[in-house]
């Protein structure tokens, strides 16, 4: 039963976040070139073991996470400080940019 609820719950969370239809990937790239790239890299592949890779991540997930960091509902000292300065448009643009980066996964 739990196996069926988890995917359904995950899908519900993703669908609850409005899509960033009007997001501007180029504006997101410019924003990422500022603070974001220091930890997450311009290519979304972090060199910092404390920071996750963002390349190819689901756009709605990224937008939800950034919104929660900004609003204090998700806690990380660095991210709460950085996200506090982001507007809804900034969040949509960053999420669209990092989600648009294609990643090749090579199985072991």
What are the language-model segments listed below?
Residues 1-5:
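Positively charged n-region of N-terminal signal peptides that target proteins for export
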Residues 17-23:
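Bacterial Sec-dependent signal peptides at the C-terminal "C-region" and cleavage site
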Residues 23-43, 55-57, 106-108:
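Sequence/structural segment immediately N-terminal to covalent heme-attachment motifs in c-type
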Residues 22, 42, 82, 97-99:
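Residue-level hotspots at or immediately adjacent to binding/recognition sites across diverse folds
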Residues 29, 41-71, 80-85:
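Gly/Gly-Pro-rich "capping" loops immediately C-terminal to redox-active cysteine motifs
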Residues 6-17:
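Bacterial N-terminal signal peptides
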Residues 32, 69, 97-98:
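Conserved hydrophobic/aromatic "anchor" residues
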Residues 60, 74, 84-108:
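C-terminal capping alpha-helices of c-type cytochrome domains
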């Amino acid at each position: 039963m739990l196996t069926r609820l988890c995917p359904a719950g995950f899908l519900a969370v993703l669908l609850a976040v409005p899509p960033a239809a009007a997001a501007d990937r180029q504006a997101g790239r410019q924003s990422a070139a500022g603070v974001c790239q220091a930890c997450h890299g311009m290519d979304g592949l972090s060199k910092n073991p404390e920071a996750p890779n963002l390349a190819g991540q689901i756009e709605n997930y990224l937008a939800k996470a950034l919104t929660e960091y900004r609003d204090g509902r998700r806690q990380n000292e660095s991210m709460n400080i950085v996200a506090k300065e982001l507007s809804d448009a900034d969040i949509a643009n960053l999420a669209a940019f990092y989600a648009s980066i294609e990643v090749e996964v090579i199985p072991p």
